[in-house]
Curated annotation (Swiss-Prot):
Name of the protein: Potassium-transporting ATPase ATP-binding subunit
Catalytic activity: K(+)(out) + ATP + H2O = K(+)(in) + ADP + phosphate + H(+)
InterPro entries found in the cross-reference section: ATPase_P-typ_cyto_dom_N, ATPase_P-typ_P_site, ATPase_P-typ_TM_dom_sf, ATPase_P-typ_transduc_dom_A_sf, HAD-like_sf, HAD_sf, P-type_ATPase_bsu_IA, P_typ_ATPase
Keyword Metal-binding listed: yes
NCBIfam families, per database record: ATPase_P-type, kdpB
HAMAP family: KdpB
GO molecular function, one term: P-type potassium transmembrane transporter activity
Species of provenance: Photorhabdus laumondii subsp. laumondii (strain DSM 15139 / CIP 105565 / TT01)
Gene name for this UniProt entry: kdpB
Active site: 313 (4-aspartylphosphate intermediate)
Length: 688
């Protein structure tokens, strides 16, 4: 897959869509759309009437009936074409993904030991739990987690990004995807899925899934359109006997014909939005994929448009994410070198960027070399989201580093005293927007390591846009409240959650949802999975863990947490497109009434000619012009349905006024102009 944007009307896509639009004329396919199914039945009935007239079995104007039948079929075909074109774009994207999926040979290890026994096995035979080693130049055979090693990986086949990425054990960049290529070094990977369940397989099935589930708003709108169709159907059915009765009573005029009744019905029902509704939904998912985000369903895209609370991780979303150790700040009585030595020891097995930067800073400041933890008989204590600290046990030294509250609990649990001087150091670092990392040895606090982070350029303006859209932004961070408050003020977020734990994230989401709000968040770690599963829109990072990707309802192939803002924009654009075209369609119908109703009943009530405010040539030309316009307007709106309406951040009332002016008033005016032009053309060409 590449990031190359498909043009809206590529010749291949149009050719395939034209063929698919004919195939979709099968009754089973038409039945899924109640509005267009009525048009489909009307097309068939007028065709039968036209054939009967040609055969002399039925009295009527065969030329007029044939033209009505032809344009009713065009209406069906144009609606099919819109949906087929939207689906064709998704199928083309799926085809490029299928080109990535291929069977290769993998080197399977019998144990987690890189130097242990190994054997060759086809990639499609690998199962969850199998361990493989991938050397430079080889293809990663399965989705999995890196358990040893680090390498430069080319993920362009999946993400479209040509720049290689680093995948390594530990941290948030340990997840690898089958079908990508190792460019340098080596990786030992534990497979996390069985054959047929890989991320690539799921991407393909999501993109090309023929049985697209309708979203709740789409279902609600379909019910409304169906109800309107049934009402107009009942009205039109009663008009024929009413017309016959009127002619008999008045002894003048002619009854309305079945052909005109069918044309009247098709023009009364909301065929414009009925024909484009499915295409809008498919195109929404396609636009999401063009942004390198895979949505599990249209429901997720639609929910993104309704979101009013964004939970954003500080690191990588609001800040650049590469926090680096900048300073060792010892407490009184402790030398800076002793603090640096303890901090380095606790970080030797720490795979995070922060841990590595501490090792580098200690080496630069005091020429402290890395030591082998095995030779020291040391036990590394990994970071936990629950304890919020990590460290090492070496000989009689128990060294820990972590958040200030976590170290305080650790010291107090070991009957030590947490000095006030540390609080002063922590506040000094926090007020500058840095992150304080407290280091302790046994029951004694040694000092603070200052970590620097930088707020991304332009992020404050983006949050201002969110605010204008009525969306509340909340920064989530493990930092203390002072640091969080400083960065939140600099970034311009509405609120923040400091010292966040998985339980705190989950509780915050549930709190907002209990207030009737829809919540969106991003995540990449296993500890994010519960909150991702609870959120209404959950965007998991492709570089994250398998648990996070399974808990989310979207996956960002670029692993860019800031993408959440773009996801919300695409979701709102899809809802705006559906709402705008619905407004345009209903306004269209109101305008069409002025053209077709006087024309339809002119033969029964000649006095109704006074309502011919557009001065159309004749009742037959008026009816045919309206039917032709009803079909052509679908074609003209296909680009808008697929690309989406232009969306600018503003409050709901201003947005409503803008759309009523553009699509409401535009929908009223367009039919008057279009029908009149078609009537003039018909008068010149065929009608007398």
């Amino acid at each position: 897959m590449t990031n190359k944007q498909q043009t809206l009307f590529e010749p291949v896509l149009i050719r395939n869509a034209l063929m698919d639009s004919v195939k979709k004329c099968h009754p089973a396919a038409q039945w899924r759309n109640p509005v267009m199914f009525v048009v489909y039945l009307g097309s068939g009935l007028t065709t039968i009437l036209w054939i009967a007239m040609l055969a002399g079995q039925f009295k009527g104007n065969a030329l007029f009936t044939g033209n009505i039948a032809l344009w009713l079929w065009f209406t069906v075909l144009f609606a099919n074409f819109a949906e087929a074109l939207a689906e064709g774009r998704s199928k083309a994207q799926a085809a490029s993904l299928k080109g990535v999926r291929k069977t290769s040979w993998a080197t399977k290890l019998h144990s987690a030991n890189r130097n242990g026994s190994r054997e060759k096995a086809p990639s499609d035979s690998l199962r969850k739990g199998d361990i493989v080693i991938i050397e430079a130049g080889e293809t990663i055979p399965c989705d999995g987690e890196v358990i040893e090693g680090g390498a430069s990986v080319d993920e362009s086949a999946i993400t479209g990004e040509s720049a290689p990425v680093i995948r390594e054990s530990g941290g948030d960049f340990s997840s690898v995807t089958g079908g990508t290529h190792v460019l340098s070094d080596w990786l030992v990977v534990e497979c996390s899925v069985n054959p047929g369940e890989t991320f690539l397989d799921r991407m393909i099935s999501m993109v090309e899934g023929a049985k697209r589930r309708k979203t709740p708003n789409e279902i609600a709108l379909t019910i409304l359109l169906t109800a309107l169709t049934i009402i107009f159907l009942l009205v039109c059915v009663t008009l024929l006997p009413f017309s016959i009765f009127s002619v008999e009573i008045n002894h003048s005029g002619q009854p309305i014909t079945v052909t005109v009744l069918i044309a009247l019905l098709v023009c009364l029902i909301p065929t414009t939005i009925g024909g484009l509704l499915s295409a809008i939904g498919v195109a929404g998912m396609s636009r999401m994929l063009s942004a390198n985000v895979i949505a599990t369903s249209g429901r997720a895209v639609e929910a993104a448009g309704d979101v009013d609370v964004l939970l954003l991780d500080k690191t990588g979303t609001i800040t650049l994410g590469n926090r680096q150790a900048s300073q060792f700040l010892p407490v009184p009585g402790i030398t800076e070198q002793r603090l640096a030595d303890a901090a380095q020891l606790s970080s030797l097995a720490d795979e995070t960027p922060e841990g590595r930067s501490i090792v580098i800073l200690a080496k630069q400041r005091f020429n402290l070399r890395e030591r082998d933890l095995r030779s020291l008989n040391a036990t590394f204590v990994p970071f936990s989201a629950m304890t919020r600290m990590s460290g090492v046990n070496v000989e009689n030294r128990m060294i820990r580093k972590g958040a200030v509250d976590a170290i305080r609990r650790h010291i107090e649990a070991n009957h030590g005293k947490f000095p006030e001087a540390v609080e002063i150091l922590v506040q000094t670092v926090a007020r500058k927007g840095g992150t304080p990392l407290v280091v302790a040895e046994n029951q004694q606090v040694l000092g603070v390591v200052a970590l620097k982070d930088i707020v991304k350029g332009g992020i404050k303006e983006r949050f201002s846009e969110m605010r204008r859209m009525g969306i509340k932004t909340v920064m989530i961070t493990g930092d203390n409240r002072l640091t969080a408050a400083a960065i939140a003020a600099e970034a311009g977020v509405d609120d923040f959650l400091a010292e966040a734990t998985p339980e705190a994230k989950l509780a915050l989401i549930r709190q907002y949802q209990s207030e009737g709000r829809l919540v969106a968040m991003t995540g990449d770690g296993t500890n994010d999975a519960p909150a991702l599963a609870q959120a209404d829109v959950a965007v998991a990072m492709n570089s994250g863990t398998q648990a996070a990707k399974e808990a989310g309802n979207m996956v960002d192939l670029d692993s860019n947490p800031t993408k959440l803002i773009e996801v919300v924009h695409i979701g709102k654009q899809m809802l705006m497109t559906r709402g705008s075209l619905t407004t345009f369609s209903i306004a269209n119908d109101i305008a069409k009434y002025f053209a077709i109703i006087p024309a339809a009943f002119a033969v029964t009530y000649p006095q109704l000619n006074i309502l011919n405010i557009m001065h159309l040539h004749s009742p037959t030309s008026a009816v045919l012009s309206t039917v032709i316009f009803n079909a052509l307007i679908i074609v003209f709106l296909i680009p808008l349905a697929l690309k989406g309406v232009s969306y600018r951040p503003m409050n709901a009332s201003a947005l409503l006024r803008r759309n009523l002016w553009i699509y409401g008033l535009g929908g009223l005016i367009a039919p008057f102009i279009g029908i009149k032009l078609i009537d003039l053309l018909l008068t010149l060409l065929i009608l007398k």
